[in-house]
């Protein structure tokens, strides 16, 4: 076990094993409760999220997660409800059994077009709790195949085929219209409704593929400094296009869809500095 503060090679950060002991007991408890049956989707998430809690201990490393569930997974849809409660003295406390779920966003994925009421309910739930997001897979896949579905009309046609005739028919349409593709590449193209860890970029089998500019560290009046910051971020993230991934599926994903991005954080502070 690495001692606290030791530098980690690869993607960086420092070790902090302070939560490691808790991780093993939590995982043992989760698995013990499921003896004789399959884990539920939420229990699977908790296994990953408990590891994330361990990683961020000491606030010197980061973890981000996106959990995508089937559209009809009712347990997942309500997993974060009643996360907080008040005792008789009015003090708020978090449910210790659910605490780790805060480490990831929960999104239900629709492969057919959701009704207006479904969308309204999802947005309303997000307004009240910050959770309850839904995703329309055909649109995500269409956006992620922009190299072949080059305009809105083609994307609309794909979405219509996928929604009304199913994923297999949409797959055949892509292959006959723009292929032939290998089965492996076709599988990858049709699975591009996955997300990078913070959800900025659609795709499949991603590590974090984003560089971030901290706007709150930049002078709002210094345009040259801003250009240099974003240029540095672009050069930094471009390194991932040459990173030697150990896992084959990550290497294949980069081969089929070599996408990286630049984003920013601290916009609110940036605007305060700029406008008061």
Residue ranges, per PLM feature:
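Flexible, glycine/charged-enriched surface loops at secondary-structure junctions
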Residues: 34-46, 55-67, 240-255
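Catalytic alpha/beta active-site cores
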Residues: 1-38, 42-46, 179-186
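Conserved, charged catalytic cores of large soluble enzymes
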Residues: 18, 22-31, 50-177, 264-276
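Function-dense linear segments that define catalytic or interfacial modules
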Residues: 1-9, 125-275
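Generic structural signal for well-ordered, non-membrane alpha-helical segments
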Residues: 16-20, 24, 40, 44, ...
